[in-house]
Amino acid sequence: MAEVANNEQQAPQFNIQRVYTKDVSFETPNSPAVFQKEWNPEVKLDLDTRSAKLADDVYEVVLSLTVTAQNGGETAFLCEVQQAGIFSIAGLTEPQLAHSLGAYCPNILFPYAREAVGSLVGRGTFPQLNLAPVNFDALFAQYVQQRQAAAAEEANA
């Protein structure tokens, strides 16, 4: 019986406690002049994630999106959204936990952030902006690779 209880404690657990908008900003520094120009924007998306341990097995993950639209060499709009979540995560190895915090949780948060960006852009009366899906697993793998390469370079120096 004690063996069964021990096995249950070791089973991975993942729960979403809360998803919330932590910070939001929308700027149209060149309005109303920007509305008088032909709309042919260059849109740039910057992503960032960070996580913090709040308590035993409880983590906050924040996904930051910054969308900048340039039209005719001027900033049409700048939209920043920080979408956050509180997650209970237990029973994972360190590499599994790092992957969960760096890829799995941001993947959960992204649709909320994408909707917030789309809503803000629409309220600014700009054409609809649909952000493409993001492969957070690939971004996390790239991040891990870069860290390993930097560590190897430091060891060889």
From Swiss-Prot:
Keywords for the protein's UniProt record, in alphabetical order: Chaperone, Cytoplasm, Protein transport, Translocation, Transport
Highest taxon in the source lineage: Bacteria
GO MF annotation terms: unfolded protein binding
UniProt cross-references to InterPro entries, sorted A to Z: SecB, SecB-like_sf
Gene Ontology CC terms, in alphabetical order: cytoplasm
Coiled-coil blocks: none
Compartments in which it is found: Cytoplasm
UniProt cross-references to Pfam families, sorted A to Z: SecB
BP term (GO), one: protein transport
Record-linked HAMAP family: SecB
Family of the protein in this entry: Belongs to the SecB family.
Physiological role: One of the proteins required for the normal export of preproteins out of the cell cytoplasm. It is a molecular chaperone that binds to a subset of precursor proteins, maintaining them in a translocation-competent state. It also specifically binds to its receptor SecA.
Subunit structure: Homotetramer, a dimer of dimers. One homotetramer interacts with 1 SecA dimer.
The protein's name: Protein-export protein SecB
Gene: secB
